[in-house]
Amino acid sequence: MNFLRQTIATCTYDLRSLSKWDAGFVLFWFAGPLLYLIERTPADIWLSLIGIGFIAHSTRANEWEWLRAGWVRFTGLFWAIALVGAAISVNPLYSLGEAVAWIRFPLYAAACMFWLGANRNRLVMMLMMMAVAVVIMSGFLITEFAANFALNPNAKTRLGGPYGDLVPGGFIGKAMMPLAMVMAAIAIGRPIRQGLLMGLFAGAMVGVVIITGERMNSVLLCLSVFLASVAWVIRPARVIQYGSLAFIGLAVLFMALPNVGDRFWSSQNQETSDYFNSSYWFSVRPGIVAALDNPVTGIGVGMHRKLCEDIPHGPDWLVGENNCHPHPHQFYVQLAEETGIFGFLAGIAMIGAIIIAAARGRRNNTLFSRLAWIPPALMFMPQPSAD
């Protein structure tokens, strides 16, 4: 409680030293995790406004040094290529709109790095807001899971959460990943009596994502917790202790809930053993066909959802059939399909620059800087996005 009071007091003092414009946006930034609980649209508006506010702040203060960052320049190159491809697509107005809107994501990242999150106490306060949001979302998901289990203990359903779709675990597994990482790193760095609660909190986040049935989000969060456990301080004995607790916890979870375990083991084995005859491959395939048919400029940003039904079967050597979704459920296939070979290469360069910039921050030897490379490295790891 003393730490909480001290953090709030320090943040309050920090806000008083800022202009009303900057202080207002910092408070608005803190509200993000709670807005995310409402629905994704309010969260998307929040993210977009942060980006617009950052541009306005840079203009008012004449602070444009952030444009010199290598990852920002590679992002600009990729965006320029995407805009050109969108402009010459079969539906330029729609595709240009999608391409212009895409820039909100790197703008938000830049705003956090160079403006809103440039203060340690603000980062700690944001993590506290994330913790509140995680507890609330976990309550939603556990309640839904308990209700489903009470109605049919053997049902192999995925949770919908407050969003009504099948990927609510992405909120905890991806958006709240930094919280789990920091909790795990601090737990490893302290004697087990002092760090146990933080370690259990990180483990509970993993457990909640697992019961949603979302395998990729579960794997990503598990990997992030493990990497954070060895990226800050190396304590082999504590890693073994917490690893043993995690193993026991997962074993108990899968034995108590065999339907959850079946989705992660039996169903996964069936799908991966015959991948090229699975719905996952069928959703990726039309993106590959479109990329092969439009190798230079691609079909335009966001055009997969518009053109998928018209994408031909493609070459006979490309096994399987086409199955249309809003996107091909594979990030790198989508890059090649929508922006062509130049966008694909520029996108890879952008991703590499982001990871390298985050990794170089390890030289500062602070908790946050030592862990910063983990989220982009995992998020951009080649993976299906439909599971």
Predicted regions, residues:
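Alpha-helical transmembrane segments of multi-pass inner-membrane proteins
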Residues: 29-33, 107, 121-155, 163-234, ...
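A membrane-periplasm/extracellular boundary helix in multi-pass inner-membrane enzymes
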Residues: 211-212, 229-276, 285-293, 301
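Transmembrane signal-anchor hairpin modules in multi-pass inner-membrane enzymes, especially those
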Residues: 1-97, 114, 118-124, 128, ...
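Membrane-embedded alpha-helical segments of multi-pass membrane proteins
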Residues: 41-58, 99-110, 169-179, 219-226
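Active-site-proximal inter-transmembrane loops
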Residues: 149-167, 316-329
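Loop-to-helix entry and N-terminal half of a specific, functionally important transmembrane alpha helix
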Residues: 24-32, 326, 356-387
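Non-cytosolic membrane-interface motifs at loop->transmembrane helix junctions
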Residues: 94-101, 156-161
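Long extracytoplasmic/lumenal interhelical loops at the membrane interface
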Residues: 271-285, 297-339
